[in-house]
Amino acid sequence: VPVPRLIPIAHEADYRTDRIGHYDDGLFLASAWDHHAYVHLFDRDGAYRRSTITRVADRAALAEALDGLLAGLSGMSYGDIAIQLFQTHQDDVTFGLIDESGDRAGDGSHVDWVELYPDRLGFHEPWDGLYDT
């Protein structure tokens, strides 16, 4: 099954996709990685709008920085989302949901695969919102 137009991402409380859901203007996906706290915003149909990415010097400040980014989203609630592919860059880091379909094993077989960066979460058939790391 080819990569769908909208990639489902399941909300998992207290785990790697615990900061995703809906807000008054659409959908959001937020996380922290290395020295970056970020929130990606999408319209209600899952189309990418923009990202806010904050670099913190002290990794101990990541949770506070992420909470600050989410505080600006009115009507926020956590839950499953479905979004389109997107890509952006900041501080020489790629952020996005990127189609990496192809011969991933090097054996000539084709795999439909989408990777969330920089988190390195892989989505694939049956496209149910669950991921591999």
Language-model segment annotations:
Residues 1-133:
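Sequence signature of WD/YWTD-type beta-propeller architectures
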